[in-house]
Amino acid sequence: DIKKGEIFGLLGPNGSGKTTTLKLLLGLIFPTEGRALVLGKTTNDVAVKNRIGFLPEESCFYRFLNADEILDFYGQLFKISRKERKARIDRLVEQVGLGFARKRPLRQYSKGMLRRIGIAQALINDPDLIILDEPTSGLDPIGTRETKDIIVSLKERGKTVLLCSHLLSDVQDICDRVAILDKGKLQISGTIDELLSSKDVVEMLIRNLSDEAISEVETFIKEKHGEVISVKNSSGTLEGLFLKIYAANINNSKTDV
């Protein structure tokens, strides 16, 4: 049960049933038992399919077309007017960071660029439900961060996002709730906090404290029968460092100009 306006992560090892679940929701296959409802309707309802955007794990495009042309093609399939198609295409190519390459044929695109145009394709019909299968596959840290920002912005606009990814850090960053499948069965589901929080372990972030004061804090905790598991300096992430260097170089380039 996925709630309207949330980002829901679907996780599981290879062969767990994630792709089968997506195919059921898209009406590409049908259940042998029970039923699947999407936006309150059965999955064979054509009107419902018009309200869904889908990014498959591997996108197949006509590589001789450029970004504008491929998005226009998909827009025509949804019977979007020419004026509205142009407005959406202009917005989407900029949103996914492909404005500089919109007139290049897709055969000249890198894997990451093709992933970006795939995301734009999934949004061309302004869907209510967006299903994304490995959306950050092939993207560098900058593209990954921008893609996650796009997904969060969809939620802010009231869209519902179903996200499948093997990159658990991405899921943890942006998903409201997750479900874990294994061997075709739901193993567990809930919010990130519900699934990961531990009542027995408390984390404290402290700054501007001397080594002597830290030692006193440790002693106090032990006196209260607590256990200090580790004390170490705070560290960032490689993604954070990468983005920091990239932002600094961008600022330096602007200064040089």
Regions found by a protein language model. Give the residues of each.
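ABC transporter nucleotide-binding domains
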Residues: 2-163, 168-182, 188
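Short, charged/small-residue-rich alpha-helical element at the C-terminal edge
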Residues: 192-257
